[in-house]
Curated annotation (Swiss-Prot):
Localization, UniProt: Host membrane
Keywords carried by this UniProt record: Host membrane, Membrane, Signal, Transmembrane, Transmembrane helix
First and last residue of the signal peptide: 1-27
Keyword Transmembrane: yes
CC annotations in GO: host cell membrane; membrane
Transmembrane segments: 143-163
Family note: Belongs to the HHV-5 UL121 protein family.
Pfam families per UniProt: DUF2677
Protein name: Membrane protein UL121
Amino acid sequence: MWGCGWSRIIVLLPLMCMALMARGTYGTYICSPNPGRLRISCALSVLDQRLWWEIQYSSGRLTRVLVFHDDGEEGGDLHLTDTRHCTSCTHPYVISLVTPLTINATLRLLIQDGMYGRGEKELCIAHLPTLRDIRTCRVDADLGLLYAVCLILSFSIVAAALWKVDYDRSVAVGPKSYKS
């Protein structure tokens, strides 16, 4: 029967999709572009010159890499930063760091907080306890695919529900008999 169960699903699915989209906006996306390297990406709503990545190793050592830096500054080929515009994301700027593969480390995207540069605010965080947490970079941190899947599922459920209503009506009326 149609009942109220289907109507709840039809209403809840788009809401769940929106929650997934909102949840993914400030999360980090971790993958390995090639053996021995690690790519961490974070989506932001605005760009700022005061952004940097912080890597805290299990030994306690800290490494900081500025997102916007001069070519002559520290970092070189060891840590590469990348900024790109994401047209289908809720937050349109994706900040990425490519660094040597590290396990048992914590990676953070930070911004200088305060008027005079005192303190910092954490925008994204990623913990890398094992290699199982890292996937290959086949799909970038773009939420467009997730959004498309949610839309397709929503329309499929609505179409199935409408078909079910039409089928129930035709069964209730009964088969049509044709007289010759």
